[in-house]
């Protein structure tokens, strides 16, 4: 009887320890040095092809360093978001080519592509990236112009009399 009591106390202690752990604990990923991961990201009219491989954190976009391609610091911060969430900021090198769209669309496409490639590299990152909303494609695109109107929603001025 006492042995059963001791075992149950141990189980209860383990359960309380596990419940006290933080929810977003980032597990250590087993990284294969020889592998390279490919993913495509899309946003508006931009399509990014992203190659992710183990390295020192170097990011190249259309044969230019990230700082040269995106001069704005806010764009750079959003592109680095998947690495900050998974705490792998200096573990991967990124090479990507982007076509179509503007700067904002290209930024979103690169972000989506990096997130998908990170998910392929280590499946333990899937829950973290999903919770951050980085794996879902942002499907918002420009609404088309309708005939008889000035723009997509703007109409000609209406006169009652």
UniProtKB/Swiss-Prot annotation:
Pfam families: Ribosomal_S9 (PF00380). One of its GO terms (biological process) is translation. NCBIfam families: PRK00132.1. This is Small ribosomal subunit protein uS9. One of its GO terms (cellular component) is cytosolic small ribosomal subunit. PANTHER family: RIBOSOMAL PROTEIN S9, SMALL RIBOSOMAL SUBUNIT PROTEIN US9M. It comes from Rickettsia typhi (strain ATCC VR-144 / Wilmington). Disulfide bonds: none annotated.
